[in-house]
């Protein structure tokens, strides 16, 4: 049986497209990056202490059921452990030097180790990223390439007091053919986004944008095909947080949704973050000893379903999940309306109507997913009849 229903297709209206935001505009079809959010916090669904040998865990990568991390001072080992327990293996990167390894990232072939910590004096001239093949790591015969960079807007004229520079960095993500780094600005608690190629060589890191974080960024990871970046960090009072960037256009990482989420693990110096699907993330904190407390290094599981599922798997201006049901999905983009459906709809006619019921467009569904240019549609509201197979 075919049951007809209606779906409103909006004209090209800019605004906040996230239903979870304070200022969500259901009529908006273009995300203009203005979404604001209520204060929110999450608690780890699971936390396990790490071995003492990884007291200064700094970066984190998830690869299947394995987590990879490293320390940030002198130690040249990569450490692999299961996300289910703390049994670990060490893989030394022979011939390398760890000045301040602060984060790691990966693509299909390589691990990338960011030796770019710069908080002690703010005047390093040897910022670099080491690139090593994953297969070489597992074979124990590691050789590495070097990617060197300098910030385009930094003029080095001497040293600064520790933890005062705006050119420290502890976070990076490999996205496409680029490395994206996020600075740790100690004075303003903002973060500048820089990019440069991921191929070995020497580069000037180009400044793309600045994020008003209100905290110190210490780790990053990305799911490029979902337009999603997760950042982690902490406040000066050691209140850890996540900072989510998502639904941004192209490589304009600052131009989409920006949401800060507190982590209910106070005084944990969170340093690394990783995810494989955006719904379950993982972070690590290094050992912290103060006069009034001692925090062990740990690995935390973070369920982000309530924060990101609607975006990742459906919803306005969101990325639809793979359609295996008898339903037609509609997604509005800047210049097109994307229509996708079950293969059983091939050969089915469709039509788009305005609110007066006039047929504006009609045709036949010839492919499982196709786009309709909106340039010939005047701004306004339209009705699109879709059917469900019952």
Indicate where each model-derived feature is located:
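C-terminal outer-membrane/trafficking sorting elements
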Residues: 320-390
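Primarily marks secretory-pathway-exposed extracellular/lumenal segments that are disulfide-
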Residues: 7-38
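Disulfide-stabilized cysteine-rich extracellular repeat microdomains
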Residues: 21, 26-29, 33, 225, ...
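Bacterial Sec-dependent N-terminal signal peptides
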Residues: 1-15, 39, 318-319, 358, ...
């Amino acid at each position: 049986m075919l049951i007809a229903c209606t779906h409103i297709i909006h004209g090209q209206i800019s605004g906040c497209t996230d239903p979870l935001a304070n200022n969500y505009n259901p009529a908006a079809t273009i995300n203009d990056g203005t979404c604001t959010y209520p204060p929110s916090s999450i608690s780890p669904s699971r936390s396990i202490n790490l071995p003492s040998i990884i007291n200064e865990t700094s970066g984190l990568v998830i690869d299947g059921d394995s987590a990879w991390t490293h320390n940030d001072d002198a130690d040249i080992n990569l450490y692999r452990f299961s996300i289910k327990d703390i049994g670990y293996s060490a893989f030394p990167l022979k011939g390398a030097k760890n000045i301040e390894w602060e984060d790691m990232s990966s693509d299909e072939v390589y691990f990338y180790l960011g030796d770019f910590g710069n908080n002690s004096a703010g005047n390093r001239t040897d910022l670099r990223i080491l690139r090593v093949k994953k297969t070489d790591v597992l074979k124990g015969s590691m050789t590495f390439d070097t990617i060197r960079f300098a910030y385009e807007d930094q003029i080095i004229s001497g040293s600064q007091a520790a933890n005062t520079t705006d050119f420290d960095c502890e976070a990076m993500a490999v996205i496409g053919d680029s490395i994206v780094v996020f600075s740790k600005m100690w004075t303003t608690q903002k973060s500048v986004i820089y990019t440069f190629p991921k191929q070995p060589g020497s580069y000037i890191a180009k400044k793309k944008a600045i994020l008003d974080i209100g905290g110190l960024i210490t780790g990053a990871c990305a799911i490029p095909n979902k337009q999603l970046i997760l950042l982690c960090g902490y406040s000066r009072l050691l209140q850890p947080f996540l900072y989510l960037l998502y639904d941004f256009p192209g490589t304009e990482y600052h131009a989409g949704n920006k949401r800060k989420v507190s982590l209910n693990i106070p005084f944990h110096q969170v340093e690394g973050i990783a995810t494989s699907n955006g719904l379950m993330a993982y972070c690590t904190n290094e050992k912290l000893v103060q006069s009034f407390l001692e925090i062990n290094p740990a690995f935390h599981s973070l369920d982000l379903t309530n924060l990101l599922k609607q975006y990742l798997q459906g919803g306005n201006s969101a990325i639809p999940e793979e359609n295996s049901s008898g339903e037609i999905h509609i997604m509005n983009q800047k210049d097109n309306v994307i229509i996708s459906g079950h293969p059983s709809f091939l050969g089915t006619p469709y039509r788009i109507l305005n609110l007066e019921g006039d047929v504006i467009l009609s045709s036949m569904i010839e492919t499982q997913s196709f786009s309709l240019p909106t340039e010939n549609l005047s701004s306004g509201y339209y009705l699109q009849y879709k059917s469900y197979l019952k």
